[in-house]
């Protein structure tokens, strides 16, 4: 089954991400990975990760839950990445970020 990413929230200090996805129903996945799943990405879950653009990537999925608007709003409001000031300077202001390649193109 293919899943489509609707939106993603990243917590850069711990490397955890949350994505709102659409498959057979709308869901929220909580995961850790070295890749970023931007909105519009289409992937297939497999035993040890996901297949994205015909390539398999390891991913640790901690939980999958039915989409809940209130929970998603809470996750979005606590989003640390990207901070608003960074859009002006093109520099990440998070000294504790553990993500090696910024999905937002910040340095």
From Swiss-Prot:
**Biological source species:** Shigella sonnei (strain Ss046)
The subcellular location is: Cytoplasm
Q: What's this protein's family per the entry?
A: Belongs to the IraM/RssC family.
Question: This protein is called what?
Answer: Anti-adapter protein IraM
Keywords in alphabetical order, please: Cytoplasm, Stress response
* Free-text function comment from the UniProt entry: Inhibits RpoS proteolysis by regulating RssB activity, thereby increasing the stability of the sigma stress factor RpoS during magnesium starvation.
List GO terms (cellular component aspect).
Answer: cytoplasm
Example of a GO biological process term:
cellular response to starvation
According to its UniProt record, where is this protein mainly located?
cytoplasm
Domain of life per record: Bacteria
Q: Which NCBIfam families match?
A: PRK09919.1
